A protein has these predicted regions:
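N-terminal mature-domain "stem" immediately C-terminal to a signal peptide or N-terminal signal-anchor/transmembrane
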Residues: 17-89
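Positively charged n-region of N-terminal signal peptides that target proteins for export
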Residues: 1-4
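Sec-exported extracytoplasmic/periplasmic mature domains
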Residues: 42, 119-123, 223-231, 258-262, ...
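Acidic/His/Gly-enriched intrinsically disordered linker/tail segments
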Residues: 217-281
Length: 332
C-alpha cells in the first residue's frame, strides 16, 4: 500500500514555481469598495427593528435581503424574533471581530490583485465591485458571490485555534481538517473560488474519475494563475507536508489509480474518497491529503499544457476534461 514520503527537495521544487513569469497587471483598474456590513448590522436598534432594517436595506439592498433570508434563514414573519436573538448570541463575536479585523488591508490587496488577474484573463467578465464583510451563524455560509459583490463571513476566519471551532458542536460541523483552514490567509483564495464557480459552474456529476480529476485540476490551475503570489498550500488547501508528499509519491499515486482500474470508474461510492475533502485519503496513509484527485488533475492539466503551450486560460477551462485527459498522456 502506498505511503507518503517527504524530502526537502520537494520544497525547492515548489518554490521554483513561484518564479514563473506573470503578466503585468499594474495598468488594470479594478474598483473594489469594502463594506463592513457587520458594523452597520450590529448597530441597528432592535427596539426600532423594522425602520432600522429598512434603513440598512436602503444602504445595501441586495445583500441585506441575502443576509436576512439566506444567511440568517429568517422570514419577514419571524425576523422580529430571529434578528435580536442572533444579535444577542453573536455580540461577543462581533466585539472579537471588531478588534481582530480592525484592518483588512492585506486581504483587500490580495483580493483586488486576484480580480486584476481575472480581468486580464477574462476581459469580458463582469467583476464584483464590492467586498462585503459580515458575521453570520457559525453553521451558515462563509463565502458568497452576489450580483455585484464578494461577501465574506468573518465568523469563518477567526483562526484555527479559536474556541468556537473546537467545541463539540464546532467539531461536528467542521472537523480539524476543515477548521485548520479557518485563517484569514485563505480569504483571497476562497473569494477566487467563488469567481471560478461563477465563470464556469462545475458540471461533472456522473463523469468518470479521470474527468472529475481534470475538472478539479483546471480549477486549481485557475487559482494559481489569478493568485500567483499565494502559497501552494493555501490554494490547494493541503498542508505543506501533504503537498510535499504528493509530489514525492506522484508516480505511486498514479499507479494506484491505473492498477485498480479507477480512472473510468463512475460509482460515487468507489471514487468519492478521492474527490472529497477529508482528513486524508485512507489508501495512501494518514499523511496524505483528502481530495487527492485535485492534485492528480492539476498534474494532468500541466502535462496537457506542456504539449499545448499557447492555450489561454479561458480556452483551457472550456476544453472538455475528456480531451485534456486523452491529449495529456500523463505518465509520471
Amino acid at each position: 500500500m502506498t505511503k507518503f514520503l517527504f524530502t526537502s527537495a520537494i520544497v525547492l521544487l515548489l518554490g521554483c514555481q513561484s518564479f514563473q513569469k506573470t503578466p503585468d497587471i499594474s495598468a488594470i483598474d479594478v474598483p473594489l469598495t469594502t463594506i463592513r456590513f457587520e458594523q452597520a448590522f450590529f448597530a441597528i436598534d432592535t427596539l426600532q427593528l423594522d425602520p432600522s432594517l429598512q434603513k440598512l436595506a436602503g444602504q445595501e439592498h441586495f445583500f441585506t435581503q441575502d443576509f436576512l433570508y439566506n444567511i440568517l434563514a429568517t422570514t419577514p414573519q419571524t425576523a422580529a424574533k430571529d434578528v435580536p436573538q442572533f444579535m444577542r448570541a453573536y455580540q461577543s463575536m462581533y466585539k472579537q471581530v471588531s478588534t481582530q479585523f480592525a484592518s483588512l488591508k492585506t486581504e483587500e490587496a490580495a483580493i483586488k490583485e486576484g480580480l486584476q488577474y481575472v480581468k486580464y484573463y477574462f476581459p469580458d467578465y463582469k467583476l464584483p465591485t464590492k467586498l462585503i464583510t459580515f458575521i453570520g451563524p457559525i453553521n451558515s455560509f462563509g463565502n458568497i458571490i452576489t450580483i455585484d459583490a464578494l461577501a465574506v463571513g468573518l465568523q469563518m476566519y477567526l483562526g484555527k485555534n479559536d474556541p468556537i471551532y473546537l467545541t463539540e458542536e464546532g467539531q461536528n460541523l467542521y472537523p480539524v481538517y476543515v477548521s485548520r483552514r479557518f485563517e484569514r490567509a485563505y480569504m483571497a483564495t476562497n473569494c477566487m473560488k467563488n469567481i471560478i464557480d461563477d465563470l464556469y459552474p462545475l458540471q461533472d456529476a456522473g463523469a468518470p474519475l479521470c474527468e472529475q480529476m481534470v475538472e478539479a485540476g483546471k480549477r486549481l490551475y485557475f487559482l494559481k494563475k489569478v493568485l500567483p503570489h499565494e502559497a501552494d498550500s493555501i490554494v490547494t488547501g493541503y498542508t505543506a507536508a501533504q503537498l510535499e508528499g504528493c509530489y514525492k509519491s506522484e508516480k505511486d499515486i498514479w499507479s494506484f489509480f491505473v492498477q485498480n482500474n479507477l480512472l473510468y470508474e463512475k460509482d460515487p461510492s468507489l471514487i468519492g474518497d478521492y474527490m472529497h475533502d477529508g482528513p486524508n485519503t485512507a489508501v495512501f496513509g494518514d499523511s496524505s491529503p483528502g481530495f487527492i484527485g485535485q492534485f492528480v488533475g492539476y498534474r494532468i492539466v500541466e502535462a496537457f499544457l506542456e504539449k499545448n503551450k499557447e492555450t489561454s486560460l479561458d480556452k483551457l477551462l472550456k476544453i472538455p476534461a475528456k480531451i485534456i485527459f486523452e491529449q495529456a498522456k500523463y505518465k509520471p
